[in-house]
Each structure stands twice: as structure tokens, then as C-alpha cells.
């Protein structure tokens, strides 16, 4: 073994296997592409994205960590969302007031 070397197992890693998913139709109504990262509280994403923000409360994109989805102007997408886990607290972005999602 080489110091720092990592040995990976075989096969694909399945993420969010037990998470309750919802599907959301999203359209970028702006004139520039918008990217949304894997752990962004989805209702707080760019205001140019048109979707049911109330239904998406407490959810994030169902994509691997450190990745993003790019929404091109005028293009409709259907995305899969999963609940934010852990403490379910969101600070920063546009949540007013910031803090726990379930309070």
C-alpha cells in the first residue's frame, strides 16, 4: 500500500435509498443559466426558477454531494428532491428567519 492510497470497493454507490422523494417541474424564466448545488434548500434557489416553492420546503436535489444541476433559460426540467436530513437547519441564503425548518 502507498501512503494516502485509497482502495475502493466494486460496484455503484446508491444514495438516498430510503429517502422519500418528490418530483418537481422547474423552468428557468431568466435569461442566464442557473446552477443549484446538491445541498441547497431548494425553495431558496435562484428566483428565476419557477416551481412550487411551498411544496419543496425542506427538500434538496436528489444528486450526489458536491454536484449541481444546471437549468438553461426557458428549458423545463423535472427534478427529484429528497428531504434535508440531520438538524434540518438552514442558515444564510433567503430563509427568513434562518434556522430550523420544522419550527
Curated annotation (Swiss-Prot):
Catalytic activity reported: urea + 2 H2O + H(+) = hydrogencarbonate + 2 NH4(+)
Subcellular location: Cytoplasm
Keyword field: Cytoplasm, Hydrolase
GO cellular component: urease complex
Pathway(s) the chain acts in: Nitrogen metabolism; urea degradation; CO(2) and NH(3) from urea (urease route): step 1/1
Gene Ontology terms for molecular function: urease activity
InterPro entries: Urease_beta-like, Urease_betasu_sf, Urease_subunit
Enzyme Commission number(s): 3.5.1.5
An example Gene Ontology biological process: urea catabolic process
Family to which this protein belongs: Belongs to the urease beta subunit family.
Subunit structure: Heterotrimer of UreA (gamma), UreB (beta) and UreC (alpha) subunits. Three heterotrimers associate to form the active enzyme.
Database matches in NCBIfam families: PRK13203.1, urease_beta
Name of the molecule in the record: Urease subunit beta
Organism (species): Mycobacterium marinum (strain ATCC BAA-535 / M)
Amino acid at each position: 500500500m502507498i501512503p494516502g492510497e485509497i482502495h475502493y470497493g466494486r460496484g455503484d454507490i446508491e444514495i438516498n435509498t430510503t429517502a422519500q422523494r418528490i418530483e418537481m417541474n422547474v423552468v428557468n424564466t431568466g435569461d442566464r443559466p442557473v446552477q443549484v448545488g446538491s445541498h441547497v434548500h431548494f425553495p431558496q434557489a435562484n428566483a428565476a426558477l419557477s416551481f412550487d416553492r411551498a411544496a419543496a420546503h425542506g427538500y434538496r436535489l436528489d444528486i450526489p454531494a458536491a454536484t449541481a444541476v444546471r437549468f438553461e433559460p426557458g428549458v423545463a426540467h423535472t427534478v427529484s428532491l429528497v428531504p434535508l436530513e440531520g438538524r434540518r437547519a438552514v442558515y444564510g441564503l433567503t430563509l427568513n428567519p434562518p434556522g430550523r425548518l420544522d419550527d
